[in-house]
Amino acid sequence: MKNKEADTELESRLLEILVHPCRIEDIRRELPNAGKNNLKNALDALVADGRVMKNKKNRFAVSAHYGCAAGTYLATERAFAFVAPDYPEGEAKPDDLFIPPNASGGAWHGDRVLVKVSERKNNRGRKEATVIRVLGRAGKELTGELVQRGKAFFVQPTSKKYPEIAVDKHDLGEAAVGDCVAVSISHYGDEQFMPQGVVRADLGESGTMEAAIAAVLHENGVYDVFPNEVLEQALAIPQEVDMGTAGKRLDLRDKLIFTIDGDDAKDFDDAVSLEKLENGHYLLGVHIADVSHYVTPDSPLDAEAFRRGTSVYFPGHVVPMLPFALSNGICSLNPKVDRLAFSALMEVDKDGRRYGAKFAKSVICSKARMTYNKVNKILAGDKGLREEYAFLVETAETMNNLAHALYKRRIERGALELDIPEAEIRVDENGKPVEIRFRERGESEKLIEEFMLQANEAVAEYMCKRELPTVYRVHENPDPDKLRVFASFARPFGYRIDPSKPEDTAQFQTVLRGAKNDPKQRVLPTLLLLSLARARYADECIGHYGLKAKFYLHFTSPIRRYPDLVAHRMLQKALLGEEFTAADETMCEEAADQSTNREQAADNCERDIDKLYIASYMQQFIGEEFDAEVSGVQSFGVFVALENGCEGLIRAELMTGDFYQYDEEHMAMVGRHTGKRFTIGTPMRVKLLAASDTTGQIDFAPADGSLPVSEKLDRPRREDTDRAPRGNRAERRRHSGKGRGGKPGKGKKPPTRKRR
């Protein structure tokens, strides 16, 4: 992981001094004004974090001087592991270190560790290392099956990356043998004793999909039930707007304002409007639910929203950031009722230039609850819908024209439009998956996307130019090493990518345009995505690479994203002219870190639960054959994707007809004798062997003797940057969209699937 900035200026100075070993007396001479206690505390913190070590001669130095490194321990399901070393902000990520069997030092998956690096390398050229100290444990709770052997009880963790845990019979709670349980670790074990734990929750009968889903939620810290004090506060809030307590507001209730969301949406946190101004420009209004009016700082609601960070969506379900009384009730911009909002009113011309923006707390009354499907049909000329919604047809058409202009300007400035298909899982009334299809983005989806982008950028620009604290959404430039890999895959298609110039996004736009028009190149957007950094939240405005935006934050989804709620509070404080304090800056920093972590947990949760639903759906097709495409390559086999987005593994031992070896540099599996290559994008005919709705694992085998359908060019794989400004993948799942459905196509080529 990346190092956080030194907590104090003193720590920064110490890291500079300790490039060479120093005694404490030497350090004091270098820093005479530091103070004895301050110096001791700073040194202790650096040693505890693994950045500084003390040798037997009581000399301090940065860990690298002693051939050591701090990092994150990454266990595997086998005896060996890896460590991802820490690295300074702005530098390229170093290669993972190989931890051979019996060199773990008692570390568990996800722990922060200090390792001694050897000059010896494993058979794949990775440096080996030995764990010499566990700096910090990743977490104290795991899930697994409760089993009994004789009179003893154990929990076998769901993930084989963790060891078995012994549980005393008095620590079983209400759990029965065979249940899936959550267990907290009371002792991590050593050479004499195995790990010990206490059962904290019974998640249901092991071996069921319901228990598997509960385990995924628990492992990611996602809990459906709100604390009583939070529910009490939410239920005490009136479900009708009280203008007497709403404060001074801009009254927009007579304006043509409406929402556009998915068919199944229940919470509406954004509405839009558009008016023609006397100068020929437009007043674009983006009106966001004023959650900050109801969720006040340091309240039980606020503390719980901070802890959750985001709503979590999976097929047929939502685990909300806020109780439904707020998210689906008084905060939701439901039609034909008064609602409090925070409005961004932006002056733009017909070519998409923004001339200014003002922001105000407002009261609105949405005139219609529109859906993407309806608006798309209206824009396509549906006579019935155009008659039913005649009062907004002209506005919708003007909005669409403006959205096209905004999109054009965004692309002209260098924004990357990856447009990677994303699978949508449909469930019936019983929660059973009945369809998997790719979501399509119509005109109205793109319209809302452009309008939300404008609001997010306008608020960020306002705050950043005034150097006021808030939480920004940032996206750093890509790692040149990753771009070099992408360039090597794009070269056979005639593209010349210069990895040393990541700021020149025009070169990537050329690739993306080509991929839209050539099926053979459709894998390239996914490979480019893998080369990009992951977007995150920060208390500094450093811009957004993928959007090519100098100023950017999240303002438009405070019902389901905590950083948006913080952005509202900070903006209102700025508008009122209130003084910002050091506490505000600290709060923004903490909110940014927490929001980034919770977004990652939500993405992990959604991805893993999606796998369970997809596996459940695919069980009906076991034994059947499909056309597929290689979507990833690892030493243990190749991943393949069907045309509906279902992805599974062909294990290396099932690839017959040759002895296949893993070519890590080119992400390929290569036949030693025939030279046959399996790499990203290689089409194959596959047979479905198994699908588990308790692990999400799907297994395929080659249906035609392990030979590719045709020989194709080498290419790489995966990770996240922002796609839609309204939220991450989970937010978009909330909405419906058109796409292909039914059984995975036989004889059809699959589109590339985005993986997070």
Positions of predicted regions on the chain:
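Charge-lined substrate channels and their catalytic hotspots, especially those that engage the 3′ end
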Residues: M1-G285, S292-D338, N376-K377, A668-T674, ...
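Electropositive polyanion-binding surfaces
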Residues: R29, V177, A182, H187-G189, ...
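Non-cytosolic beta-sheet module surface loops
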Residues: Y73-A75, L146, V630-G632, L642, ...
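A short macromolecule-binding patch
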Residues: E91-I99, Y162-V167, C646-Y662, S710-K712
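A generic structural signal for residues embedded in beta-strands
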Residues: V115, V183, V633, V686-L688
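Internal insertion modules embedded within essential enzymes
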Residues: R124, G144, Q192, L689-A703
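Short beta-strand-to-coil "C-cap" segments at the C-terminal boundary of structured domains/repeats
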Residues: L203, A701-V709
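Intrinsically disordered, low-complexity linker and terminal regions at domain boundaries
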Residues: R651-T694, I698, E711-E719, R723
